[in-house]
């Protein structure tokens, strides 16, 4: 299996690294993707690392990069490599790919680099699923989403996708958010203790 963090922040990459299943770097490892990631995949990550400031055209905030003018070219090259690596995996792997997204939480609505309107995590994951199945029909994958924002989602609702998407999308509700990484470990990563 190949595990690919797709946001919202660096917690997923930290979790995978801590449990020795983060074997390579990907575009969303150490940044904040306020408005989801599906548009990046849809556009083959075009202009992903072109910076006018610390947030790109996809509303991805680069918290750790693009701070020092002396190394900006190095940061651009690093993200270009990560994007190319991800696209190559999507095009060529025979392994199952597990995309993991920790959904946004209430504070993301008011962070200074965030947008007033944050993408609906479920809709973005559905859009990503449609992109993946059309662009990479041979790809075996699962998208795992943990909902976290109590302003956008209710603890009283069980969120599911359409029946034809359920094989590829796994949504964990807001009431399970505190146990999201334990769920990932128990369901998708074997022999790991949290």
What are these regions (language model features)?
Residues 1-194:
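Extracellular glycan-modifying ectodomains
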């Amino acid at each position: 299996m190949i595990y690919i963090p797709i946001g919202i922040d660096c917690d997923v990459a930290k979790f995978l690294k801590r449990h020795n299943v983060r074997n390579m770097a990907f575009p969303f490892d150490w940044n904040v993707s306020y408005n989801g990631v599906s548009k990046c995949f849809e556009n083959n990550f075009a202009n992903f690392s072109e910076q006018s400031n610390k947030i790109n055209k996809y509303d991805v905030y680069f918290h750790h990069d693009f701070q020092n003018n002396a190394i900006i070219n190095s940061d651009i090259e690093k993200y270009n490599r990560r994007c190319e690596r991800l696209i190559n995996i999507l095009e060529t792997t025979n392994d199952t790919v597990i995309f993991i997204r920790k959904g946004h939480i209430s504070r993301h609505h008011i962070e200074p680099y965030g947008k007033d309107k944050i993408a609906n995590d479920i809709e973005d994951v559905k859009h990503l699923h449609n992109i993946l199945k059309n662009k990479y029909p041979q790809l075996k994958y699962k998208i795992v989403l943990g909902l976290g924002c109590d302003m956008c989602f209710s603890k009283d609702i069980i969120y599911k996708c359409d029946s034809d998407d359920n094989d590829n999308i796994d949504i964990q509700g807001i009431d399970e958010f505190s146990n999201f990484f334990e769920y990932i470990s128990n369901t998708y990563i074997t022999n790991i203790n949290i």
